[in-house]
Amino acid sequence: MEADAPAGYRDPSGRHGAVTLPARPEPIAFDADATVLIVVDMQNAYATKGGYLDLAGFDVSATGPVIERIARAVAAARAAGIRVVWFQNGWDPDYVEAGGPGSPNWHKSNALKTMRRRPEMNQRLLAKGTWDYALVDALTPEPGDIVLPKPRYSGFYNTPLDSMLRARGIRTLVFTGIATNVCVESTLRDGYHREYFGIVLADATHQAGPPALQEGALRNIETFFGWVSDVAAFEAALSSDEARRIPA
């Protein structure tokens, strides 16, 4: 392989993808038809005042621009023929899927701990069918998109994601959403261990907690598990690929 070749999946002949995305720690190439854009947990719970994160004491005041940039990434992906996968984190209204005291999730989930501390919140936080569980109004799945519920941080845990990706020949996962340091990183890590190439569009993500957690998560990803880029670079790379495919 050439020293200056981009990272990314190569087919048996050694050909890398047609789209090259500037990224850290190096550019990465992918084919649009072997890529999905994953939107992680853009629910009222995580991105809206009065949602779970806000009620649990996390700052959600900066999520507006993130939502706008995710909308741009979704539009660019759809225009390039990249399928969009939406995740919604949560459980049934009785929280059976959340696990009881025998599950570490029962002890570590801030949503469950908030409801135990504030019983009036019970069956309101991250319960399927509630406002908290719903995607934010500005981001709407369209026909052809994939919408998956997930009961834990990783989108690979107890979901059909892996089989759905493999059935479609997907090799590259482009991530947006909340929270960078929790569900985004957890899903990207699990994808890495399943031989998927993971890319995070940093300015289309937001952390749960102080800004240092965003910086740390992105540094961890680019050093050990994947690649980090941004929405403008993603749009430009896809536009360049589209221009190359249009006959003169």
Swiss-Prot record:
It catalyses: (Z)-3-ureidoacrylate + H2O + H(+) = (Z)-3-aminoacrylate + NH4(+) + CO2; (Z)-3-ureidoacrylate + H2O = (Z)-3-aminoacrylate + carbamate + H(+); (Z)-2-methylureidoacrylate + H2O + H(+) = (Z)-2-methylaminoacrylate + NH4(+) + CO2. SUPFAM superfamilies: Isochorismatase-like hydrolases. Disulfide bonds: none annotated. Hydrolyzes ureidoacrylate to form aminoacrylate and carbamate. The carbamate hydrolyzes spontaneously, thereby releasing one of the nitrogen atoms of the pyrimidine ring as ammonia and one of its carbon atoms as CO2. GO terms for biological process: nitrogen utilization; uracil catabolic process. The keyword Hydrolase applies. This is Ureidoacrylate amidohydrolase RutB. Belongs to the isochorismatase family. RutB subfamily. PANTHER family: ISOCHORISMATASE-LIKE DOMAIN-CONTAINING PROTEIN (PTHR43540:SF6), PEROXYUREIDOACRYLATE/UREIDOACRYLATE AMIDOHYDROLASE-RELATED (PTHR43540). Keywords: Hydrolase. CDD domains: cysteine_hydrolases. Its EC number is 3.5.1.110. GO terms for molecular function: hydrolase activity, acting on carbon-nitrogen (but not peptide) bonds, in linear amides. It is an enzyme of class 3 (hydrolase).
